Design a protein with these regions (language model features):
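Alpha-helical transmembrane bundle of multi-pass membrane proteins
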Residues: 8-280
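Short intracellular "coupling" helices and adjacent cytoplasmic loop segments at the cytosolic face
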Residues: 1-6
Length: 280
């Protein structure tokens, strides 16, 4: 990667966004024109992370105790969960280089749907029978691993890549606010679901987060684009053209065919809209 070319492309992207009047001075710009779609994706990516069921893993020690484990076993299982979470996070470094963000995000929502449905069914059918606690414990540990392998780290990549360069800071700030609101709801609801003196639904809480994960999965399938290997300029082109979600992966090939990426910096600057013609 040539650093000078990268900097020149960033400057070129900024000039293009100025030409398109993307704004950048007000939070209202986040909801104007094509920026509205980018704001939606950034906010929903973080909300999906909050609703994917990982709140169960954050309350793992308490969840394990309510599932029937003693305090010592609950602590040991929680430590095991954190261990596999670290392993998943390390493995995600490699996956992000070779697997698309969209695939990882969809996988990170589909797997919880399956695991949480299994957890809910086990809780209903087995109740407090021997073996049910270990099955739920294994599901929570698996949830921790797959969360840190997929949706956990990928969310931060998406939220940084989706916004326009001139509105990135404001978009990330707003997306984080929406995430915090979702987490506040989780922090209110989760203790009540597990507390024996409140709702006391125990493992049946898995059904709730299986439902929210499924809704998020449907949204991501239709609305979350693939951003891997796309520059900010290429993303600007796609969003400005109102490209369908399924078309984002095709832009790289189209630009290669028009030789735009092989042009020198001088040639690119003389042909500012060449990239647009590649996606017409």
């Amino acid at each position: 990667m040539d650093i000078d070319d990268t900097i020149e492309l960033m400057q070129h992207t900024n000039r293009v966004e100025k030409t398109l009047k993307y704004g950048g001075g007000s939070y209202l710009d986040l909801f104007k024109g094509v920026n509205r779609r980018r704001t939606e994706i950034a906010c929903m990516a973080w909300i999906c992370q909050a609703l994917s069921g990982w709140s169960l893993t954050s309350y793992a020690p308490y969840f394990f105790e309510q599932a029937g484990f003693d305090a010592s076993s609950s602590f040991n299982l929680s430590v095991a969960g954190y261990g596999v979470g670290i392993l998943g996070g390390i493995m995600s470094w490699t996956l992000l280089s070779f697997v698309g963000r969209r695939k990882l995000y969809l996988s990170g929502l589909l797997i919880p749907v399956i695991l949480l449905l299994a957890g809910g069914i086990i809780s209903v059918t087995l109740g407090s029978r021997r073996g049910a606690d270990w099955a739920l414990g294994a599901i929570i540990i698996a949830m921790t691993f797959f969360y840190d392998l997929t949706i956990g780290p990928v969310c931060y990549v998406l939220v940084a890549e989706i916004p326009s360069t001139r509105l990135r800071v404001k978009t990330v700030a707003l997306a984080r606010v929406t995430y915090n609101i979702a987490i506040m709801v989780n922090n209110i609801v989760m203790p009540k679901m597990l507390n024996p003196s409140a709702w006391n639904i125990g493992g049946k809480a898995c059904f709730l987060y299986a439902s929210t994960s499924f809704v998020c999965l449907i949204w991501c399938y239709f609305r979350l684009p693939e951003t891997r290997k796309l520059t900010y300029l290429e993303l600007d082109i796609l969003f400005e053209k109102k490209a369908p979600t399924s078309k984002f992966k095709e832009l790289q090939d189209r630009l290669d065919e028009t030789a735009y990426l092989s042009m020198t910096r001088t040639e690119q600057l003389r042909s500012r809209w060449h990239g647009w013609l590649a996606y017409s």
